[in-house]
């Protein structure tokens, strides 16, 4: 697949969307691409569609602008991030039929290649890691890097899962060099979530 910048030529309006019950990688990749467009292609009118994004990711730039219900309009381009199949598309599912072009950027080996263009890297830790390789690194701002780092951290289990590779670490290092507050991101995006999950599990076991 070409770099995102090449694909955007001729695009005036586009939608960015993720899967049902979006996690950190889904939210991070969607908002990372959204921020990249705001920074480098402000002439493109872009909308992000996510189904009830979790509040622990509200620190991410662009979070408040996410649309949680679908506006059935015809976009020049619809980009699906971290969505392995058409059945997994969230609120944006109706947009595909009217889109001028559809692209899926994903890392799941189960991806069904349901879009016109499908860029899938099963060995990647996350959709954010895949997306990083499709962006012009020198054009990635700190807010964009913050979103991408969030996705990598959550889907790699803070670099503990087997999907973590040397390439994952190099991408994370490149994002850190953009100035991301990595300690806060790890705390907010991963450990706070884990703490809450443990509390819920504890209450369930007591009951």
What spans do the regions from the language model cover?
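Short, glycine/acidic-enriched loop or turn micro-motifs at the edges of active sites
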Residues: 22, 26, 83-85, 109, ...
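Divalent metal-coordination and catalytic microenvironments
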Residues: 23, 33, 57, 79, ...
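Conserved strand-to-helix beginnings and helix N-cap segments that scaffold or border functional pockets
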Residues: 27-31, 90, 165
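Generic beta-sheet signal
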Residues: 49-51, 81, 105-107, 122, ...
């Amino acid at each position: 697949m070409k770099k995102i910048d090449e694909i955007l030529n001729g695009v005036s309006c586009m939608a960015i969307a993720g899967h049902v019950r979006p996690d950190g990688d889904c939210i991070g990749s969607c908002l990372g691409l959204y921020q990249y467009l705001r920074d480098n292609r402000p002439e493109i009118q872009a909308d992000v569609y996510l189904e009830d994004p979790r509040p622990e990711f509200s620190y991410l730039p662009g979070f408040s602008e996410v649309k949680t219900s679908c506006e059935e309009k015809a976009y020049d381009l619809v980009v699906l991030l971290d969505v392995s199949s058409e059945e997994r598309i969230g609120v944006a599912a109706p947009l595909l039929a009217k889109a001028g072009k559809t692209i899926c950027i994903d890392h799941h080996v189960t991806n069904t290649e349901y879009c016109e263009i499908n860029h899938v890297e099963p060995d990647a830790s996350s959709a954010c890691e895949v997306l990083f390789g499709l962006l012009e690194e020198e054009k990635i701002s700190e807010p964009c890097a913050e979103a991408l780092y969030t996705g990598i951290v959550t889907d790699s289990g803070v670099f503990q899962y087997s999907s973590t590779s040397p390439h994952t670490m190099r991408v994370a290092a490149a994002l850190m060099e953009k100035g991301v507050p990595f300690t806060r991101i790890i705390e907010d995006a991963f450990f706070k979530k884990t703490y809450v999950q443990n509390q819920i599990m504890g209450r369930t076991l007591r009951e």
